[in-house]
Every structure is written in C-alpha cells, then in structure tokens.
Amino acid sequence: MVSGHDDAVDITLRAYETAAQRYADRTGGPGPASCAFLDRFADTIGRVRVLESGSGTGKDATYLEGRGLHVSRTDAALAFVEMMCAAGHDARVLDIRTDDLGGPWEAVLALAVLLHLDRAQFADALRRIREAVVDGGVFAFTLKEGDGDAWSEAKLDLPRHFTYWREPSLRPVLAQTRWDVISIDYVDGLEPWLFVMARAA
C-alpha cells in the first residue's frame, strides 16, 4: 500500500532497488523505435561525452557505445549501478533530483526516467540538466503520453508512479527551462510515448 506521506519518486525508487533483477529479466534491449531514436541522437551529437541518467540495466548505453560514443552511466538505484559494475562497466549512483550532475556535458540521455517525476520535479530537472550542459548541447528523453498521473505494478509487481504528458503542455516547460525543441515524436507501443530531443538555448 502506498502511503500519502512518502514521496512518489522514493516509492518508485524502492521498487527498482527491490526488483532490479526482475526488471532486467522482463525488459529486453532497445526496440526498433528506441534504436532509431538512439541512432538519430548519435548522429545529432557526434562522438561526444554523454551523461545518461537512469541507465537501468545499461542496454541503451551499450547501444550508444557500439556507435562509438562514451557514455557515463548513472542510476538513482544502487541495485542497477551494482548490476552494471558486475557486468564490467563503470557506473555511479546519481539522483537527477538532488545530486551534482557534473559537466559541462555535450549531451544528456534520460530514457523512461523523467516520467517518474511530478510536474514541478520535472521542470526542476530540466533546469538542472540545462545548467550542466554546454550551450548548444543536446538532451534526449522519453515520456509516456497521456493525461494526469497514475500508479502501476506492471513489470515489477511493485508500485511505480508515472506522470503523463502531451506535447502542448510539454513545449512551454521546455521553453521556460531554456531548451529549444529539435523534435517531439509520437511512438505507439503497448502504450503511447513521446520521444523528445532538445537543444540547450
């Protein structure tokens, strides 16, 4: 049972800490839409250093490394960091809400990460990432498309919180946090997604 006194992101993070292996077992590598998005991201940024927030099992980082990019893998869940380190990768714990992002970075990647933040936390994360990126740097991320927010126990059998977005409400937040939209693509899957790429203004 989810307590109203607990932060939704912290509850979600505990779910990942508890069931990281279950997540890995139930999640494959990047699908065709994600691969196409990662390819476009790589083509846009060239061979630069990429900060990845929410690396999870590291599958997206591995794909980009195959394209010749250097990816700094991070995750707020220690269980995922330990999993990546055990596989021979450098990785560190980083909470996008509070931790120093380092930099300046030429590019940042956050696939299926920011969708766990509420709207105020999301805007704050965009500001923090902008401060850690060089002018003209590129930020790529994905969100679930829709209205409102909801809890789900899908995939992990534990509660995770999701905030849904639509393009008309997303664009002003990007502009207010000094990001110029490169592209916002609608991707249909089991659920509709928004694949977003923006450039630091």
Where are these regions (language model features)?
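Short catalytic micro-motifs in class I SAM-dependent methyltransferases
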Residues: A112-H116
